[in-house]
């Protein structure tokens, strides 16, 4: 079978992408939250593909950076470890303005264990949030946001889904 270039434009699922600005980003994230009723810090990062300065498809992942006792587990000297990540979908509102907003949702999975890994559990996570964004330069933006982490399926010692769910800033 021989092929020849077609003279007409080829139809594609996303259409003519040459008319749409797109690029990528990545960066660190620090979140202040609560785990099992105690102050906690999550550190991690997120990145994605920015489509037409309005929509982001990406991913993110976060891990517990503070020490917490593993409630309900009879293992001395072991701390709780937790992490989660997933797909991020984000809508950016008025990205050309000095200060603008975005709204996002992370949908994914996480895990909780002890420092020695003697017990472990996996869970579902959904984390909607909003951010206030500041354009520092054309290629550098800083965001300040709030989110709520919903977890489901947690059965780890005396911890349940409510203990790992919570607001974050």
Predicted regions and their residues:
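N-terminal signal peptide c-region/cleavage motif recognized by signal peptidases
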Residues: 3-5
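Short glycine/proline- and aromatic-enriched beta-strand/turn motifs that initiate or cap beta-hairpins
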Residues: 7-57, 169
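Outer-membrane beta-barrel domain signature
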Residues: 15, 32-36, 74-78, 116-120, ...
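Residues that define the transmembrane beta-barrel architecture of outer-membrane proteins
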Residues: 22, 39-43, 79-85, 99, ...
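Membrane-embedded beta-strands of outer-membrane beta-barrel proteins
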Residues: 26, 45-47, 87-89, 103, ...
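Outer-membrane beta-barrel pore domains and translocons
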Residues: 29-33, 62-64, 106-110, 147-151
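Gram-negative (and chloroplast) outer-membrane scaffold detector with strong preference
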Residues: 54-136, 140
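Predominantly the C-terminal beta-signal and adjacent terminal strand-loop region
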Residues: 133-169
């Amino acid at each position: 079978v021989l092929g020849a270039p077609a003279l007409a434009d080829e139809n594609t699922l996303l259409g003519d992408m040459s008319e749409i600005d797109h690029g990528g980003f990545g960066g660190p994230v620090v979140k202040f939250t609560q785990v099992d009723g105690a102050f906690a810090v999550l550190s991690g990062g997120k990145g994605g593909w920015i489509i037409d300065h309005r929509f982001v498809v990406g991913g993110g992942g976060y891990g517990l950076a503070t020490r917490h006792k593993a409630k309900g587990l009879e293992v001395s000297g072991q701390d709780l470890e937790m992490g989660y990540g997933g797909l991020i979908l984000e809508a950016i509102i008025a990205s050309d303005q000095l200060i603008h907003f975005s709204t996002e949702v992370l949908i994914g999975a996480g895990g909780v264990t002890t420092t020695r890994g003697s017990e472990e559990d996996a869970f579902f996570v959904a984390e909607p949030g909003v951010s206030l964004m500041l354009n520092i330069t054309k290629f550098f933006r800083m965001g300040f946001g709030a989110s709520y982490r919903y977890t489901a399926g947690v059965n780890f010692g005396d911890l349940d889904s409510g203990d790992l769910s919570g607001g974050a800033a």
